[in-house]
């Protein structure tokens, strides 16, 4: 009979311990109830990207001197620079410039080392397509400035996320 009483007492202690653990978890859940939601409704709400965000590369054709520094510093040897040597003025003339964003790792080396600052990073990050060949941007597509999220009236921008308290 005594073993049965001790088992019943152990069962009671285990029940109290389990209820305490459940209560602790419930208290953590309730402590999060008064916080603002962290999630955003993506297609309709977007976060404003930081100033140093590395998005799609913008290219200014008139500034480029076809020095190919961007090709040399790129870890993927990605930018394709076609140029022709003008013998009368002894300078290179840029014919075509293209970057395949399906291969680009957005490291920013080409932007950092460009001597004429003809390359810059934009805040555009929505580059998905159904055909991977559409990710190969020529100088015309690279020269197009993206629409700013701030200027788009159909999208609600979120400036500050609520800080997570630890």
UniProtKB/Swiss-Prot annotation:
| Pfam families attached to this UniProt entry | Fer4_9 (PF13187)
Q: What's noted on cofactor binding? A: Binds 2 [4Fe-4S] clusters per subunit.
Q: What GO terms fall under cellular component here?
A: chloroplast thylakoid membrane
Q: For binding [4Fe-4S] cluster 2, which residues are annotated in this chain's numbering?
A: 74, 104, 107, 110
Residues that hold [4Fe-4S] cluster 1 according to the record: 64, 67, 70, 114
The cysteines covalently paired via disulfide bonds are: none
Q: How does it sit in the membrane?
A: Peripheral membrane protein
Key word Cell inner membrane present in the record? no
Top-level lineage group:
Eukaryota
State where it is primarily located.
plastid
Signal peptide per UniProt = none
Which Gene Ontology molecular function entries are recorded, alphabetically?
4 iron, 4 sulfur cluster binding; iron ion binding; NADH dehydrogenase (ubiquinone) activity; quinone binding
Q: What's an example Gene Ontology biological process for this entry?
A: photosynthesis, light reaction
Protein localization: Plastid, Chloroplast thylakoid membrane
Q: Which InterPro entries match?
A: 4Fe4S_Fe-S-bd (IPR017896), 4Fe4S_Fe_S_CS (IPR017900), NADH_quinone_OxRdtase_chainI (IPR010226), NDHI (IPR004497)
User: What does the UniProt keyword field contain?
Assistant: 4Fe-4S, Chloroplast, Iron, Iron-sulfur, Membrane, Metal-binding, NAD, NADP, Plastid, Plastoquinone, Quinone, Repeat, Thylakoid, Translocase
Which reaction is catalysed here? a plastoquinone + NADH + (n+1) H(+)(in) = a plastoquinol + NAD(+) + n H(+)(out); a plastoquinone + NADPH + (n+1) H(+)(in) = a plastoquinol + NADP(+) + n H(+)(out)
The answer to keyword 4Fe-4S applying to this record is yes
EC number(s) per UniProt?
7.1.1.-
> Needs which cofactor?
[4Fe-4S] cluster
Q: What is the documented function of this protein?
A: NDH shuttles electrons from NAD(P)H:plastoquinone, via FMN and iron-sulfur (Fe-S) centers, to quinones in the photosynthetic chain and possibly in a chloroplast respiratory chain. The immediate electron acceptor for the enzyme in this species is believed to be plastoquinone. Couples the redox reaction to proton translocation, and thus conserves the redox energy in a proton gradient.
Q: Supply the PANTHER family for this chain.
A: NAD(P)H-QUINONE OXIDOREDUCTASE SUBUNIT I, CHLOROPLASTIC
What protein family is recorded? Belongs to the complex I 23 kDa subunit family.
According to UniProt, the name of this protein is NAD(P)H-quinone oxidoreductase subunit I, chloroplastic
Q: Which gene encodes it?
A: ndhI
């Amino acid at each position: 009979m005594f073993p049965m009483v001790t088992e019943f007492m152990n069962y009671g202690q285990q029940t109290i311990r389990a209820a305490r653990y459940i209560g602790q978890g419930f208290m953590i859940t309730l402590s999060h109830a008064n916080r603002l939601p962290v999630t955003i409704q993506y297609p309709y709400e977007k976060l404003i990207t930081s100033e140093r965000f590395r998005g799609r590369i913008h290219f200014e054709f008139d500034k480029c001197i076809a020095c190919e520094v961007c090709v040399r510093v790129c870890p993927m040897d990605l930018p394709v620079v076609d140029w022709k040597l003008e013998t009368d003025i002894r300078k290179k003339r840029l014919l075509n410039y293209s970057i395949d964003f399906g291969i680009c790792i957005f490291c920013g080396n080409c932007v950092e080392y460009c001597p004429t600052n003809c390359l810059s990073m934009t805040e555009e990050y929505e580059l998905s397509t159904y055909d991977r060949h559409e990710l190969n941007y020529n100088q015309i597509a690279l020269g197009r400035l993206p629409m700013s999220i701030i200027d788009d009236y159909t999208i609600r921008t979120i400036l500050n996320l609520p800080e997570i308290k630890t």
